[in-house]
């Protein structure tokens, strides 16, 4: 016993809904931190096609790793509708550091890098997010929850390949993307994205 009564937390919040929103926001913040850490480990100048591809891959990988390693926090982060849009504490940069904000920033960089055509940018974050989130749910509590780790890693690589193909600016570029053939999935995704940009002209 630590002398804390069950309803002590409510003293700091107006009601149960406000408390739940704060808990969900904190969980979403943990996910955002994991994604930001993955991006921070990627070198290269802003707008460099290879570096931009690596950053997008790092975001997706961090998302899946967090869902796998912190299933309780991951579920809590999405416990409320529209939770992805709720406030996450600022880091002093003024940037949107939410998971959705980081994905949008990575896609914007792909436009700057010449990999993703501007006319294809609007709204593309949602099908990409849906794809990665869907795999996270299938692997966490769905029919893929008991598959061997090696199989799951392969499915993750195929998911990234599918996303890369969705970013192709022309049908001819689709043939160059086979992320699963690379020994390093980050590097393979980056190579694929650079190739897509080269074939988009």
Locate the predicted segments by residue.
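Alpha-helical structural segments
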Residues: 1, 18-41, 58-65, 76, ...
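Short, surface-exposed loop/turn segments at secondary-structure junctions
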Residues: 43-53, 118, 145-147
């Amino acid at each position: 016993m630590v002398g804390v009564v069950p309803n002590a937390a409510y003293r700091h919040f107006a009601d149960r809904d406000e408390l739940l929103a704060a808990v969900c926001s904190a969980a979403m913040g943990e996910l955002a931190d994991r994604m930001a850490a993955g991006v921070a480990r990627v070198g290269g100048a802003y707008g460099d096609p290879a570096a931009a591809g690596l950053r997008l891959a790092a975001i997706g990988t961090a998302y899946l790793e967090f869902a796998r390693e912190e299933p309780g926090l991951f579920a809590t982060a999405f416990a409320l509708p529209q939770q992805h849009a709720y406030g996450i504490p600022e880091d002093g940069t003024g940037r949107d550091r939410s998971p959705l904000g980081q994905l949008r920033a990575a896609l914007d960089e792909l436009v700057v890098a010449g990999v993703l055509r501007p006319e294809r940018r609007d709204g593309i974050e949602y099908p990409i997010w849906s794809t990665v989130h869907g795999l996270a749910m299938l692997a966490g509590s769905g029919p893929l929850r008991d598959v061997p780790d090696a199989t799951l890693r392969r499915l993750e690589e195929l998911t990234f390949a599918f996303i890369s193909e969705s970013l192709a600016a022309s049908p001819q570029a689709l043939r160059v993307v086979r992320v699963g053939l690379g020994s390093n999935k980050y590097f393979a995704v980056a190579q694929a994205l650079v190739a897509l940009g080269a074939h988009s002209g």
